[in-house]
């Protein structure tokens, strides 16, 4: 299916965030572990659909980036879901290596302990694993 037709069928709702038209992109692995969340603009979505690999829009660098372009920890797209408002997309990906730039498998490795209000780090630092 051509990319424009795929985008038309998805009908994503890009929101104005800091003067840019963006949507939320959530990446999970095939075991349903939440890996990360980031923004996408329309070009990042098109590039993701064209290549089959996750591309995001960096608000801090003001550019599109391919996940893993420096680390090699790429995300291959397996499935795509849109939420009911169509302003967020959920991508099921095959994660190579780890997702987090802090070297954890998931970016969600900080846990607030509700009993003592302390932040705990969960998961293993992947650099130390190898």
Swiss-Prot record:
Cysteine disulfide partners in this protein: none
Binding site for Mg(2+): 83, 85, 87
InterPro entries: PRA-CH (IPR026660), PRib_AMP_CycHydrolase_dom (IPR002496), PRib_AMP_CycHydrolase_sf (IPR038019)
Residues the entry annotates as binding Zn(2+): 84, 100, 107
Top-level taxon of origin: Archaea
Pathway annotation: Amino-acid biosynthesis; L-histidine biosynthesis; L-histidine from 5-phospho-alpha-D-ribose 1-diphosphate: step 3/9
Enzyme class: hydrolase
Localization: Cytoplasm
One Gene Ontology biological process: L-histidine biosynthetic process
Reactions accelerated catalytically: 1-(5-phospho-beta-D-ribosyl)-5'-AMP + H2O = 1-(5-phospho-beta-D-ribosyl)-5-[(5-phospho-beta-D-ribosylamino)methylideneamino]imidazole-4-carboxamide
Keywords for the protein's UniProt record, in alphabetical order: Amino-acid biosynthesis, Cytoplasm, Histidine biosynthesis, Hydrolase, Magnesium, Metal-binding, Zinc
Obligatory cofactor(s): Mg(2+); Zn(2+)
GO molecular function, one term: magnesium ion binding
Family: Belongs to the PRA-CH family.
Function description: Catalyzes the hydrolysis of the adenine ring of phosphoribosyl-AMP.
Subunit record text: Homodimer.
HAMAP family: HisI
Protein name: Phosphoribosyl-AMP cyclohydrolase
Protein's organism: Methanococcus aeolicus (strain ATCC BAA-1280 / DSM 17508 / OCM 812 / Nankai-3)
Gene name of the encoded protein: hisI
């Amino acid at each position: 299916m051509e990319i424009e037709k795929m985008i038309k069928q998805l009908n994503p709702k890009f929101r104005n965030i800091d003067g840019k038209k963006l949507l939320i992109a959530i990446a999970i692995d095939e075991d349903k572990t939440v890996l990360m969340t980031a923004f996408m603009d329309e070009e990042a979505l098109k590039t993701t659909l064209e290549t089959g690999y996750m591309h995001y829009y960096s608000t801090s660098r003001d550019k599109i980036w391919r996940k893993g372009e420096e680390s090699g920890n790429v995300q291959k797209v397996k499935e795509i879901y849109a939420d009911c408002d169509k302003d967020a997309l959920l991508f099921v990906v095959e994660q190579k290596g780890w997702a987090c730039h802090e070297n954890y498998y998931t970016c969600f490795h900080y846990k607030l302990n509700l009993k003592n209000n302390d932040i705990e780090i969960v998961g293993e630092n992947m650099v130390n694993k190898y």
